[in-house]
Protein backbone atom coordinates (compact mmCIF):
# COMPACT_ATOMS: atom_id res chain seq x y z
CA UNK A 1 0.00 0.00 0.00
CA UNK A 2 2.74 2.45 0.93
CA UNK A 3 4.65 1.65 -2.26
CA UNK A 4 1.51 2.35 -4.31
CA UNK A 5 0.93 5.63 -2.47
CA UNK A 6 4.54 6.60 -3.20
CA UNK A 7 4.01 5.99 -6.92
CA UNK A 8 6.14 2.86 -7.30
CA UNK A 9 5.81 0.60 -10.30
CA UNK A 10 5.50 -3.14 -9.52
CA UNK A 11 9.07 -3.79 -10.65
CA UNK A 12 10.38 -1.39 -7.98
CA UNK A 13 9.03 -3.55 -5.16
CA UNK A 14 12.09 -5.84 -4.74
CA UNK A 15 14.24 -2.78 -4.07
CA UNK A 16 11.71 -1.34 -1.61
CA UNK A 17 11.58 -4.65 0.27
CA UNK A 18 15.39 -4.94 0.32
CA UNK A 19 15.67 -1.39 1.67
CA UNK A 20 13.19 -2.12 4.45
CA UNK A 21 14.92 -5.38 5.36
CA UNK A 22 18.22 -3.51 5.54
CA UNK A 23 17.06 -0.79 7.93
CA UNK A 24 15.08 -3.20 10.12
CA UNK A 25 18.26 -4.63 11.63
CA UNK A 26 20.08 -4.02 14.89
CA UNK A 27 23.16 -3.04 12.91
CA UNK A 28 21.42 -0.17 11.12
CA UNK A 29 19.28 0.79 14.14
CA UNK A 30 16.54 2.82 12.47
CA UNK A 31 15.15 3.80 15.87
CA UNK A 32 18.38 5.65 16.67
CA UNK A 33 18.30 7.38 13.28
CA UNK A 34 14.83 8.70 14.12
CA UNK A 35 15.31 9.40 17.81
CA UNK A 36 18.51 11.43 17.50
CA UNK A 37 18.24 15.22 17.55
CA UNK A 38 20.79 15.39 14.74
CA UNK A 39 19.82 16.24 11.16
CA UNK A 40 20.36 12.86 9.52
CA UNK A 41 18.35 10.43 7.45
CA UNK A 42 18.70 7.12 5.62
CA UNK A 43 20.36 7.14 2.20
CA UNK A 44 20.08 4.15 -0.12
CA UNK A 45 22.59 3.31 -2.85
CA UNK A 46 21.58 0.58 -5.31
CA UNK A 47 24.05 -1.49 -7.33
CA UNK A 48 23.62 -4.25 -9.89
CA UNK A 49 21.71 -5.03 -13.09
CA UNK A 50 18.37 -4.16 -11.49
CA UNK A 51 19.29 -0.48 -11.62
CA UNK A 52 19.17 -0.66 -15.43
CA UNK A 53 16.14 -2.93 -15.50
CA UNK A 54 13.97 -0.47 -13.56
CA UNK A 55 15.48 2.70 -15.00
CA UNK A 56 17.19 4.18 -11.96
CA UNK A 57 19.20 7.37 -12.44
CA UNK A 58 22.94 7.38 -11.75
CA UNK A 59 23.75 10.36 -13.97
CA UNK A 60 22.72 14.01 -14.26
CA UNK A 61 20.80 15.27 -11.21
CA UNK A 62 21.36 11.91 -9.53
CA UNK A 63 20.60 13.21 -6.04
CA UNK A 64 17.68 15.31 -7.20
CA UNK A 65 14.24 14.95 -8.73
CA UNK A 66 13.05 13.73 -12.11
CA UNK A 67 13.47 9.96 -11.93
CA UNK A 68 10.49 7.88 -10.90
CA UNK A 69 12.42 4.90 -9.54
CA UNK A 70 14.83 6.95 -7.43
CA UNK A 71 12.10 9.19 -6.07
CA UNK A 72 9.40 6.64 -5.32
CA UNK A 73 11.56 3.88 -3.84
CA UNK A 74 12.94 6.25 -1.23
CA UNK A 75 9.50 7.71 -0.59
CA UNK A 76 7.90 4.28 -0.16
CA UNK A 77 10.42 3.37 2.52
CA UNK A 78 9.72 6.60 4.37
CA UNK A 79 5.96 6.05 4.23
CA UNK A 80 6.42 2.61 5.81
CA UNK A 81 8.61 4.14 8.53
CA UNK A 82 5.92 6.74 9.25
CA UNK A 83 2.69 4.80 8.72
CA UNK A 84 3.72 1.35 9.92
CA UNK A 85 6.61 2.09 12.26
CA UNK A 86 5.20 5.23 13.84
CA UNK A 87 8.32 7.21 13.05
CA UNK A 88 6.66 10.60 12.71
CA UNK A 89 7.98 14.03 13.75
CA UNK A 90 7.39 14.85 17.40
CA UNK A 91 6.89 11.18 18.25
CA UNK A 92 9.74 8.76 17.71
CA UNK A 93 11.40 11.27 15.38
CA UNK A 94 13.08 13.88 17.60
CA UNK A 95 15.33 15.60 15.05
CA UNK A 96 15.87 19.28 15.81
CA UNK A 97 15.93 20.38 12.16
CA UNK A 98 15.08 17.21 10.25
CA UNK A 99 16.59 15.91 7.04
CA UNK A 100 15.39 15.85 3.43
CA UNK A 101 16.32 12.16 3.32
CA UNK A 102 13.23 11.51 5.42
CA UNK A 103 11.18 12.39 2.35
CA UNK A 104 13.11 9.78 0.41
CA UNK A 105 16.76 9.51 -0.65
CA UNK A 106 17.66 6.70 -3.05
CA UNK A 107 19.94 6.57 -6.09
CA UNK A 108 22.09 4.17 -8.08
CA UNK A 109 25.83 4.19 -8.64
CA UNK A 110 27.26 4.78 -12.11
CA UNK A 111 29.18 1.52 -11.91
CA UNK A 112 29.04 0.37 -15.52
CA UNK A 113 31.33 3.04 -16.98
CA UNK A 114 33.96 3.15 -14.23
CA UNK A 115 37.24 1.23 -14.03
CA UNK A 116 36.98 1.20 -10.24
CA UNK A 117 35.07 -1.40 -8.21
CA UNK A 118 31.58 -0.30 -7.24
CA UNK A 119 30.49 0.31 -3.67
CA UNK A 120 28.89 -3.14 -3.63
CA UNK A 121 32.03 -4.81 -4.97
CA UNK A 122 34.11 -3.02 -2.33
CA UNK A 123 31.79 -4.56 0.24
CA UNK A 124 32.40 -8.09 -1.05
CA UNK A 125 29.64 -8.58 -3.63
CA UNK A 126 30.08 -9.18 -7.36
CA UNK A 127 28.85 -7.10 -10.25
CA UNK A 128 26.08 -9.55 -11.18
CA UNK A 129 24.40 -9.22 -7.79
CA UNK A 130 21.72 -6.68 -6.94
CA UNK A 131 22.78 -4.92 -3.75
CA UNK A 132 21.39 -2.06 -1.67
CA UNK A 133 23.47 -0.15 0.85
CA UNK A 134 21.74 1.83 3.60
CA UNK A 135 23.71 4.72 5.06
CA UNK A 136 22.79 7.34 7.65
CA UNK A 137 23.93 10.72 6.39
CA UNK A 138 23.68 14.44 6.91
CA UNK A 139 23.94 16.93 4.06
CA UNK A 140 24.42 16.49 1.20
CA UNK A 141 27.10 19.15 0.87
CA UNK A 142 28.86 20.40 -2.25
CA UNK A 143 32.62 20.08 -2.75
CA UNK A 144 33.66 22.71 -5.28
CA UNK A 145 37.00 22.51 -7.09
CA UNK A 146 36.93 23.88 -10.64
CA UNK A 147 40.67 24.31 -11.10
CA UNK A 148 42.40 21.08 -10.07
CA UNK A 149 43.53 19.07 -13.06
CA UNK A 150 45.86 16.76 -11.14
CA UNK A 151 44.74 14.17 -8.59
CA UNK A 152 47.27 15.33 -6.00
CA UNK A 153 45.52 18.71 -5.86
CA UNK A 154 41.93 17.51 -6.10
CA UNK A 155 42.27 14.91 -3.37
CA UNK A 156 43.42 17.64 -0.97
CA UNK A 157 40.28 19.63 -1.70
CA UNK A 158 38.14 16.56 -1.02
CA UNK A 159 39.97 15.79 2.23
CA UNK A 160 39.65 19.40 3.40
CA UNK A 161 35.89 19.30 2.96
CA UNK A 162 35.46 15.86 4.50
CA UNK A 163 37.31 16.90 7.66
CA UNK A 164 34.50 19.39 8.36
CA UNK A 165 31.81 16.66 8.30
CA UNK A 166 29.49 17.34 11.28
CA UNK A 167 32.33 19.35 12.85
CA UNK A 168 36.07 19.50 12.30
CA UNK A 169 36.31 18.82 16.04
CA UNK A 170 34.53 15.47 15.87
CA UNK A 171 36.73 12.51 14.96
CA UNK A 172 36.66 8.69 14.71
CA UNK A 173 33.05 8.09 15.72
CA UNK A 174 31.40 8.49 12.33
CA UNK A 175 31.36 7.45 8.68
CA UNK A 176 30.91 9.49 5.50
CA UNK A 177 29.80 8.87 1.93
CA UNK A 178 31.67 10.66 -0.84
CA UNK A 179 29.84 10.78 -4.18
CA UNK A 180 32.48 11.45 -6.82
CA UNK A 181 31.23 13.08 -10.03
CA UNK A 182 32.47 11.84 -13.44
CA UNK A 183 34.63 14.92 -14.03
CA UNK A 184 36.39 14.60 -10.70
CA UNK A 185 36.63 10.81 -10.95
CA UNK A 186 38.29 11.17 -14.37
CA UNK A 187 41.21 13.06 -12.82
CA UNK A 188 42.07 9.93 -10.85
CA UNK A 189 41.21 7.37 -13.54
CA UNK A 190 43.35 9.13 -16.17
CA UNK A 191 46.30 9.31 -13.77
CA UNK A 192 46.11 5.57 -13.15
CA UNK A 193 44.97 5.75 -9.55
CA UNK A 194 43.18 2.71 -8.14
CA UNK A 195 40.27 3.02 -5.75
CA UNK A 196 42.48 1.52 -3.05
CA UNK A 197 45.13 4.19 -3.56
CA UNK A 198 42.53 6.93 -3.47
CA UNK A 199 41.13 5.72 -0.14
CA UNK A 200 44.56 5.18 1.39
CA UNK A 201 45.81 8.64 0.46
CA UNK A 202 42.70 10.55 1.46
CA UNK A 203 42.57 8.69 4.78
CA UNK A 204 46.16 9.74 5.49
CA UNK A 205 45.31 13.35 4.66
CA UNK A 206 42.48 13.26 7.18
CA UNK A 207 44.62 12.33 10.18
CA UNK A 208 43.86 14.97 12.80
CA UNK A 209 46.32 16.58 15.21
CA UNK A 210 44.26 16.47 18.39
CA UNK A 211 46.11 19.47 19.86
CA UNK A 212 44.19 21.65 17.39
CA UNK A 213 40.77 20.43 18.52
CA UNK A 214 41.12 20.24 22.29
CA UNK A 215 38.12 21.75 24.09
CA UNK A 216 38.74 25.45 24.60
CA UNK A 217 41.32 25.82 21.84
CA UNK A 218 40.82 28.85 19.59
CA UNK A 219 38.09 30.03 21.95
CA UNK A 220 35.76 27.12 21.12
CA UNK A 221 34.34 25.10 23.99
CA UNK A 222 33.55 22.09 21.78
CA UNK A 223 36.40 19.62 21.45
CA UNK A 224 38.25 16.66 22.90
CA UNK A 225 39.49 16.33 26.51
CA UNK A 226 42.87 17.83 27.39
CA UNK A 227 44.05 14.34 28.35
CA UNK A 228 44.15 13.48 24.63
CA UNK A 229 46.79 16.09 23.78
CA UNK A 230 49.61 14.79 21.63
CA UNK A 231 47.47 12.21 19.84
CA UNK A 232 46.81 11.92 16.12
CA UNK A 233 43.46 10.40 15.18
CA UNK A 234 41.66 9.55 11.93
CA UNK A 235 38.62 11.61 10.97
CA UNK A 236 36.53 8.51 10.27
CA UNK A 237 36.43 4.98 11.57
CA UNK A 238 38.47 2.32 9.72
CA UNK A 239 36.76 1.69 6.35
CA UNK A 240 34.34 4.45 7.30
CA UNK A 241 34.56 6.39 4.03
CA UNK A 242 32.10 5.02 1.47
CA UNK A 243 33.11 6.03 -2.05
CA UNK A 244 30.40 6.13 -4.73
CA UNK A 245 30.67 7.29 -8.34
CA UNK A 246 27.61 9.02 -9.75
CA UNK A 247 26.39 12.20 -11.39
CA UNK A 248 26.70 13.81 -14.79
What are the language-model segments listed below?
Residues 1-248:
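Non-transmembrane, aqueous-exposed alpha-helical and coiled segments at domain scale
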Amino acid sequence: INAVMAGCRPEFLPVVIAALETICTDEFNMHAVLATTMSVGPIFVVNGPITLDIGMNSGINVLGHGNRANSTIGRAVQLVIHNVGGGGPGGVDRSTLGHMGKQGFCFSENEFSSPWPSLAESRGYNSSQNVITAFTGEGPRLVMDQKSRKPDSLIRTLAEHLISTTSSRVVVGMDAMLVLSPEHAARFHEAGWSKERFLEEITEMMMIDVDNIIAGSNGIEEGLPAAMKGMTLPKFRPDGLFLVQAGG
